[in-house]
């Protein structure tokens, strides 16, 4: 049982948080973090704790779909690198995170049309708190684009390779499904809009 939990949810705590998130979803408490205006999204911003594992992988995976992307960590230092287990897991998935550098919240500039995609319910609440009354951005749970939905994507940092790989598989699936829902967040579309404004 422990091996199964560790490979699917990271730890017992990961399992408990996943179950609690599903319970919140079932009673409608996560409705504020649904994507309500996909056509208004101009950039996908992936968010996790340190911006060196989950959001780093999501960032580089989203680039493969031509999305206009950014990423940040809620508790990190700008310039931090992904740890060796994250680099190895990403490499097994065909992604190179060697060039990735973390960005902290103070060093991040929010833009109108940003869609913040967090990994955990508590992160969704924290991002919304930091954004204040801004109504030109949205906050969603990335795991809602998993099949089945995973409102809690537990942090793989310091955990074993099996869960690292499982977590990144879920992030990859979510990003793939998400990319189909963001018609106006493509890099080419963004560049074209900027070009029209400059004329």
Label each region the model flagged.
Residues 1-38, 128-199:
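Phosphate-binding/catalytic loops
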Residues 123-124:
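Alpha-helix capping/helix-boundary segments
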Residues 118-119:
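Short beta-strand scaffold positions
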Residues 9-112, 181-189, 195:
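Conserved active-site segments centered on acidic
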